[in-house]
């Protein structure tokens, strides 16, 4: 309703890894249609540079978290063309090939259209420095769980996102729990440098945590985490998560509606990703 009242030209959606940005943007799209606004949802992931051009971190590893992993000049040009009423040929990033491809996706904004841009760096002013702030509406999404184990032991907000990521990466990206856990330090460094400093830019903050989701993730995460070999350094974290999940009784997946944000990670969503 705030977006319908303000009528911005661009809605930015950002948040840390596995916060549910993609499903949030799709559900927001439906609500905007109800409010008589035509949303055009774009993912900033489609504007990554080709993998061979991806910057490397201090350890020589590919750094996908930095804003410099995006083709900012190309992104800015397309956004300005859209705002000027021009038609653009939208890219799609092929993660398998590690390169940007063009599949004939054309877009031209209509009078009642609004761009909805979702991505890790969406709240960073550097991505579109020439666009007036009054023309934008910024949303920060994160999973801030409100439950504790007891009166003395709180649940880190990073745990819920890590479990989401372990399940999603195994099901849809072909990564083992060992590989996902091994990438955690890089992901966390990226969030601390490129996401958290800009959360105060947001007009609205949305908590995507669900009170029942540990009980749902348990059934999916336990067998995946159990595959982590005992001799590797990632085993300690996998074992900690397995011990933590013992506190929860699993919930049958059939109880979770297909439009639930949790479906982005466990599957069975009515949305296309």
Show the residue positions of the predicted features:
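Glycine-rich phosphate-binding loop used to anchor ATP phosphates in small-molecule kinases
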Residues: 5, 76-134, 181-198, 270
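Hydrophobic anchor at the beta1->P-loop junction of P-loop NTPases
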Residues: 11-13
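Walker A (P-loop) phosphate-binding loop of P-loop NTPases
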Residues: 18
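Conserved lysine of the Walker
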Residues: 21
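Post-Walker A helix-loop "phosphate-sensing" segment adjacent to the P-loop in P-loop NTPases
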Residues: 30-40
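Conserved nucleotide-sensing/catalytic segment adjacent to the nucleotide-binding pocket
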Residues: 40-42, 49-98, 114
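Conserved NTP phosphate-binding and transfer environment spanning the P-loop NTPase/kinase superfamily
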Residues: 125-273
């Amino acid at each position: 309703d705030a977006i319908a009242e303000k009528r911005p030209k661009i809605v930015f959606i950002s948040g840390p890894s596995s916060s549910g940005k993609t499903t949030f943007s799709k559900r927001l799209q439906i609500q905007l249609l109800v409010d008589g606004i035509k949303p055009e949802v774009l993912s900033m992931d489609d504007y990554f540079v080709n993998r061979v051009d991806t910057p490397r971190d201090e350890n020589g590893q590919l750094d996908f978290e930095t804003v410099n992993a995006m083709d900012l000049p190309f992104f800015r040009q397309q956004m300005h063309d859209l705002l000027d009423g021009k038609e653009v040929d939208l890219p799609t990033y092929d993660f398998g090939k590690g390169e940007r491809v063009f599949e004939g996706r054309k877009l031209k904004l209509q009078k009642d259209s609004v761009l909805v841009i979702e991505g890790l760096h969406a709240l960073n002013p550097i991505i579109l420095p020439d666009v007036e702030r009054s023309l934008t509406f910024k949303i920060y999404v994160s999973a801030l769980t409100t439950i504790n184990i007891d009166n003395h032991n709180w649940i880190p907000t990073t745990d819920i996102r890590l479990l989401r990521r372990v399940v999603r990466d195994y099901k849809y990206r072909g990564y083992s729990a060992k590989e996902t856990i091994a990438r955690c330090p890089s992901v966390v460094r990226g969030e601390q440098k490129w996401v958290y400093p800009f959360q105060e830019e947001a007009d609205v903050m949305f908590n995507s945590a669900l009170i029942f989701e540990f009980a749902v993730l348990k059934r999916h995460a336990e067998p995946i985490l159990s595959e982590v070999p005992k001799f590797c350094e990632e085993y300690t974290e996998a074992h900690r998560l397995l011990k933590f999940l013992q506190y929860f009784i699993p919930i049958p997946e059939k109880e979770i509606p297909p439009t639930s944000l949790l479906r982005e990670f466990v599957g069975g969503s009515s949305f296309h990703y």
